[in-house]
Amino acid sequence: MCYGYGCGCGSFCRLGYGCGYEGCRYGCGHRGCGDGCCCPSCYRRYRFTGFY
């Protein structure tokens, strides 16, 4: 998932949970958290910082 702590290139991104996973896309689109590392496409689309 790409929200909360995992939003800033954190543990989830390093463990391999990329934007292809449903949790990561959910975090970018619905939580307003665009992670430039885990979800680059979502980050460019929503223009949110979301780095924790």
UniProtKB/Swiss-Prot annotation:
Any one of the GO CC terms: cytosol
Pfam family, one: KRTAP
Alphabetized UniProt keyword annotations: Keratin, Repeat
Quaternary state and interactors: Interacts with hair keratins.
Role: In the hair cortex, hair keratin intermediate filaments are embedded in an interfilamentous matrix, consisting of hair keratin-associated proteins (KRTAP), which are essential for the formation of a rigid and resistant hair shaft through their extensive disulfide bond cross-linking with abundant cysteine residues of hair keratins. The matrix proteins include the high-sulfur and high-glycine-tyrosine keratins.
Record family assignment: Belongs to the KRTAP type 19 family.
Name of the protein: Keratin-associated protein 19-2
Gene that produces this protein: KRTAP19-2
